[in-house]
Amino acid sequence: MSITEKQRQQQQELHKRLWSIANDLRGNMDASEFRNYILGLIFYRFLSEKAEAEVADALADEDVTYEEAWEDDEYREDLKEELLENVGYYIEPQDLFSSMVKEIENQRFDIEHLAQAIRKVETSTLGQDSEEDFIGLFSDMDLSSTRLGNTVKDRTALIGKVMIHLAELPFVHSDMEIDMLGDAYEFLIGRFAANAGKKAGEFYTPQQVSKILAKIVTQGKDQLRNVYDPTCGSGSLLLRVGKETKVYRYNGQERNNTTYNLARMNMLLHDVRYENFDIQNADTLENPAFMEEKFDAVVANPPYSAKWSADSQFNDDERFSNYGKLAPKSKADYAFIQHMVHYLD
């Protein structure tokens, strides 16, 4: 069997199992809602396993477990410092995804524990360089929603079932020929986009389109100092550029809060370190970020024929002032092009 065939089979198996897990939630809510739970739980598993791997390295020469080290004041502070430096957050041993899976198996799990654990991850970043990349990251995963069940017991049972299924997926395995975690995310984002119909463009650029755009802006370039997407959606287009050449920093802006969270998760899931990306949550045309910066490459799949204010104040905006006329209120396409050209170095 060729590697390509092996990859294809691994992907098909992964996709089949992922969609089966998604179907556990399908009866309770629409696709856009259960997307947030599935992707959020995958992301929490990723954060947990990342922390576990870092701690395993730190304690490699010590005869002590994660749990034992955390009970010791000196060890605990050292581990916190190491985790904050290397991954930008820390997770207490009892809050790890694997620890909660054991609770589920022993029928001791409570969904409130998961909700608290998620809050603690975000709190751990306060005052750190990583704070902006983590705060509010799970805000769309409402674990108290009655859509998951009318009682805490019902919600606990449903989320516990999903977590058990996710725990069985081999995201990290020496025999895997594909980027399991990245592929899982891209598959689910794409599948949810297909279900969303026209609204899909708000958060997802089809892989074929992303690939063409990424190849165009990286043609003949061994590396990019930075790349910018003013309407970055889930971040898939930015990440595609990184597959074509070495990218040192990713910048993006996204006005939809749910999609903004998805983009930050996607960056971290694809092992982009927290200090190497900056995704901002605001309207690109009306409230632009990064006005003091220039970029080696700018890519985008903007919302075509979108409306904007075309306020007269923008006649003096350096992005538009050289053209003598603003894009019409009914179609902002030209404004997006002018915006992108302005940011090019």
Feature names for model-found ranges:
Residues 199-300, 305-322, 334:
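Conserved S-adenosyl-L-methionine
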Residues 152, 174, 252-256, 297, ...:
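Hydrophobic alpha-helical scaffolding
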Residues 31, 156, 292, 330-334:
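Short, solvent-exposed loop/helix junctions and linker helices
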